[in-house]
Regions:
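Surface-exposed, beta-sheet-biased, low-hydrophobicity segments with strongly acidic/polar composition
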Residues: 1-150
Length: 150
């Protein structure tokens, strides 16, 4: 997976012809209700107008024109990794140390931007079954959040 501010690519297809990583966007469903990954249907990266894009991952946020802030749609994504493992993930936040709702009415600074907080769970090795996530998305964001990508 590659992250660059709001752009996410999967390292499969147009990005890496030898990588078979792809994604499925399930929309804003309950994270822990997704307990099994399908074997097929994963969309890989493609080249579109000279840019790499994964159409399943490109629409993960809403841009707020009034505050100029990025707000996660809280979609759940299934990812098939190169090593035939499966992962489910959702982006919880775009701003370091702040919850999305803290940035809805005020402008969060550029220094706080592009510090994604991602909830993710890997399927048990050799299976397509996901264990239940122990992360509480209502908890305060700290350095102990599931995955902070700077």
């Amino acid at each position: 997976m590659g992250f660059s501010r709001t752009k996410i690519i999967s390292n499969g297809g147009g990005t890496n012809p030898l990588g078979y990583t792809g994604a499925i966007n399930l929309g804003p469903v309950e994270f822990n209700k997704i307990n099994k990954a399908p074997k097929n249907g994963y969309i890989e990266d493609e080249v579109s107008f000279g840019n790499l894009i994964n159409k399943e991952l490109s629409d993960w946020y809403t841009y707020r024109t009034r505050t100029h802030n990025i707000e996660s749609k809280n979609n759940v994504y299934l990812i098939k990794l190169n090593n035939n493992r499966f992962m489910k993930m959702r982006i919880l936040n775009y701003y370091c140390g702040k919850k999305d709702q803290d940035c809805r009415t005020i402008m969060c600074s550029r220094q706080q931007a592009a510090c994604l907080t991602v909830e993710y769970v890997l399927a048990k090795n050799g299976t397509d079954i996901f264990p239940i996530s122990k992360f509480d998305s209502n908890a305060s964001l700290t350095t102990e959040s599931p995955l902070n990508i700077n």
